Design a protein with these regions (language model features):
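C-terminal active-site-proximal or functional interface alpha/beta core segments in diverse enzymes
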Residues: 189-267
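A short small-residue
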Residues: 18-23, 179-184, 218
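N-terminal glycine-rich anion-binding loops that anchor highly charged ligand groups
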Residues: 11-15, 41, 47, 52-60
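Glycine-rich, proline-tolerant flexible connector loops at the mouths of alpha/beta enzymes
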Residues: 23-29, 56-65, 225
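Active-site-proximal beta-alpha core segment in soluble small-molecule metabolic enzymes
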Residues: 51-214, 236-239
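Alpha-helical packing segments of well-folded alpha/beta enzyme cores
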Residues: 35-38, 42, 201
């Protein structure tokens, strides 16, 4: 049997007593109080560390709640043209776009919607970088830290054979157009895996700090789970900002909506 990732949910919470007959089926039901509490935690981390937190639309894109979300977060990250359009229309703030590959027919529109565009490889920077720069977007490169913290190999972006990001060992010089780096190698995890990953890549970051203006640590950080070490996170983000002289970003989806909603359905 294929191995599955365990749920991180803390239980039914307020939904334990929710009358499912009150709503149509199927539908998503959101606890707005719980959602706001999550957003307040994330905003506090941002304020304390100086890091900008973006909503990962691929994880939570209920745009009816965009007015609430954009009150607390700095923008959104998109994985393609339609998410970039959604971000522009409803969320405002900064828009970061990343995809393992971009379609040439869509790229102009994506570039004009985005503040940051993250490419998966130096080859993609060479192909689309000038186009992105002409549109006014800052250019980033996704790196593969080559440091695995994933519990399930098939979901691990650092697993052998992964094509998500450029392996650090293959990079001797960053493309000239690149002003920032992006990584995403965690999934619904605590602070310790992030700390170990940063420790693994920090020599590379220090070696290229003169070229870097920003660092995006991606998602997979379950910051709103009660046992997450938020003090440790703030210290780490602050240290990276100060020692590298960069703006630090996080892209969060599950942390935003963690234990704040249910899907009602029937068989």
């Amino acid at each position: 049997m294929s191995q599955l990732m365990p749920t991180q949910s803390q239980g039914a919470g307020n939904f334990a007593t929710f009358d499912l007959s009150r709503v149509p089926s199927p539908c998503f039901v959101v606890d707005e109080v719980a959602l706001r509490q999550n957003l307040e935690i994330l905003h506090a981390v941002s304020q304390a560390s100086g890091a900008e937190i973006l909503l990962a639309l691929k994880a939570f894109s209920m745009w009816s709640l965009a007015p609430l979300v954009r009150t607390y977060l700095s923008g959104a990250c998109a994985s393609g043209l339609w998410e970039a359009k959604l971000a522009k229309a409803h969320y405002g703030g900064q828009i970061t776009s990343y995809a393992p590959a971009f379609k040439a027919s869509e790229f102009d529109e994506i570039a004009n919607l985005s503040d940051h565009i993250v490419f998966n490889s130096p080859a993609q920077v060479a192909r689309f970088g000038a186009q992105a720069q002409q549109a006014g977007a800052a250019i980033g490169l996704r790196i593969n830290p080559q440091h695995s913290e994933g519990g399930v190999e098939k979901y691990d972006p650092c697993a052998a054979g992964s094509r998500l990001g450029q392996p650090l060992s293959d990079i001797t010089k960053l493309p000239d157009l690149v002003s920032g780096l992006h990584m995403h190698s965690l999934c619904e995890q605590g602070f310790a895996p992030l700390a170990r990953t940063v420790e693994a890549i920090e020599p590379f970051l220090q070696a290229h700090k003169q070229q870097l203006q920003w660092l995006n640590l991606g998602g997979g950080h379950l910051i709103t789970r009660p046992d997450y070490d938020r003090d440790g996170l703030v210290q780490l983000l602050t240290r990276l900002r100060d020692t590298l002289d960069v703006q630090v970003y996080l892209e969060l989806g599950t942390s935003v909506a963690f234990d704040a909603g249910i899907l009602v359905g029937e068989i």
